[in-house]
Amino acid sequence: MSPSSQFTRRHILRSLPAIVTASGVMAQPNKPTIRVRALNHMTLFVSDPKRSLEFYQGLFGMPIQARQGDSGGLLRIGTGPQYLALAAAGPNRKPGIDHFCMTVDGFNPGQTLKILAAHGVTQSDAPGPMKAWTRMRGDTVEFHLGDPDGILVQLQDTSYCGGTGQLGNQCFATPEPSPRKGLIAVRDLSHFTLSVSDANRSRAFYREVFGMRIQAYQGPSSPVLAVGMGPQFLALGRGGAATPGIAHACMTMEGFNPDRVLKTLADFGIKPRGEARGPASPLVSYVNTRMEDRGGAKSGTPELYFTDPDGIVMQLQDVTYCGGAGSLGEVCL
């Protein structure tokens, strides 16, 4: 083991007690938890739904597995039921990732409310931090809550596909095919990175409420939290009190090769960002190499990002990616 490896490991081990204490898992062992199983979907608010639909179907060849009202359709990721939804941003809402959804076995809204109440989340008629609310979409109950920063989280049954029926699990028997084959076949959701005002507080919330274990470290005090049995996860980063939100989403593909993916993106019109600084502009790509001090491989773990027509940041990684070390980020705890 190299000196830098020993240094990183030593600092991670020293950080463990503080992280566990901040999580509250040891301090509050008797509170019930909501055991989430998987990431289900994300909803993007976009300035031009037709343009975004053409973009995501053109790049990924995503079929439509269901429709909700006037939306452009729910774009299936892999074999489903996971999906990407598009909605018009409107004059008072900026484009971005509005919310993400996780699934629960035997979803029961009433029982979920009781568990959340034990953690200080109160039932409400309106969104807000530490609030929970439901809405009826036809005969489908859709459950939402706000985390400590008010970031929107949806909870549904594991069978939920955004369709009809009490559980929202009745989708098209045959999805509407994409008009374009697509250049990259995405297989699943990997993770969401949340920009939060207080990482310790948010980490405590997600670990206590959902029983999430630490799956990997991206730095001594930056654990990522497993969703279900992994490799899916949530990552938390401090973005300042004025900027809580969902910073980016990640999807996976087979045979991930950064150079080939960058070329494919360029052929589609998503050009390399180069040396530009600050927030990425629309339709650019870039690779960040996560080194050993941030839990990456000794030679670096490449992490590939691109932006859509609204500048919404997306990440692409291998299907084995778990946010850990290794050349594919596939080595986790």
Language-model features: locations:
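N-terminal pre-domain/capping segments
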Residues: 20, 31-40, 61, 98
